[in-house]
Amino acid sequence: MKELQTVLKNHFAIEFADKNLLETAFTHTSYANEHRLLKISHNERLEFLGDAVLQLLISEYLYKKYPKKPEGDLSKLRAMIVREESLAGFARDCQFDQFIKLGKGEEKSGGRNRDTILGDAFEAFLGALLLDKDVAKVKEFIYQVMIPKVEAGEFEMITDYKTHLQELLQVNGDVAIRYQVISETGPAHDKVFDVEVLVEGKSIGQGQGRSKKLAEQEAAKNAVEKGLDSCI
């Protein structure tokens, strides 16, 4: 953890008073499970807390930044900023991927590169920072790490493919659009979902993701990229 502390101090002017709290933020459940006798804490509770403060601060930022955007647009933009892939990217930017404690099996299976694990660790770090410092320090960190990319327009370019597909298909009237899970693979804490999108019972696209919502977006994207002619 000393290397992590150095990174935090040199790049973000952050020094944790409670080093155990910082270590917990970077401890995956797989590591804690492999060391049960030591009663090591994992980062899921901190992730819960970090998710809440992240949602609050990003919501506040978007509310003030875009006074004319309707609630629906703000919600979509926030969802893109705090989604799994985005948070994993921020974690990599901060070099957090190097410091996550994983179980041997998780490490061997490529867990250090998984967006779910990286995104969760990023949120857990925010939760730990909130407890060790205060919400102002979390806000300072978010504005240093995340907001520059938001203001650069990186997340405006991401398309909500489910909404886009619905708009394309319903231009001439309502049609029945349904998403269904084809398969689920992987351990309970890191599942991969395969989803297909159906229009009037006909499969028009398939997608894969670490959550059902992400898989649905990928399926909708697949359908949009095929073109409407193949959808109806």
UniProtKB/Swiss-Prot annotation:
Domain DRBM: start-end pairs: 160-229
An example Gene Ontology molecular-function term: double-stranded RNA binding
Cofactors: Mg(2+)
GO cellular component: cytoplasm
Annotated InterPro entries: dsRBD_dom, RNase_III, RNase_III_dom, RNase_III_sf
Origin superkingdom: Bacteria
Record flagged with keyword Magnesium: yes
GO biological process: mRNA processing; regulation of gene expression; rRNA processing; tRNA processing
Short name of one Pfam family: Ribonucleas_3_3
Catalytic site positions: D51, E123
Catalytic activity as recorded in UniProt: Endonucleolytic cleavage to 5'-phosphomonoester
Keyword line: Cytoplasm, Endonuclease, Hydrolase, Magnesium, Metal-binding, mRNA processing, Nuclease, RNA-binding, rRNA processing, rRNA-binding, tRNA processing
Gene3D superfamilies linked: 3.30.160.20, Ribonuclease III domain (1.10.1520.10)
Enzyme Commission (EC) number: 3.1.26.3
Subcellular location(s) of the protein: Cytoplasm
Residues bound to Mg(2+): E47, D120, E123
Quaternary assembly: Homodimer.
Role according to the record: Digests double-stranded RNA. Involved in the processing of primary rRNA transcript to yield the immediate precursors to the large and small rRNAs (23S and 16S). Processes some mRNAs, and tRNAs when they are encoded in the rRNA operon. Processes pre-crRNA and tracrRNA of type II CRISPR loci if present in the organism.
Family: Belongs to the ribonuclease III family.
Name of the protein described by the UniProt record: Ribonuclease 3
Species this chain originates from: Streptococcus pneumoniae (strain Hungary19A-6)
Gene: rnc
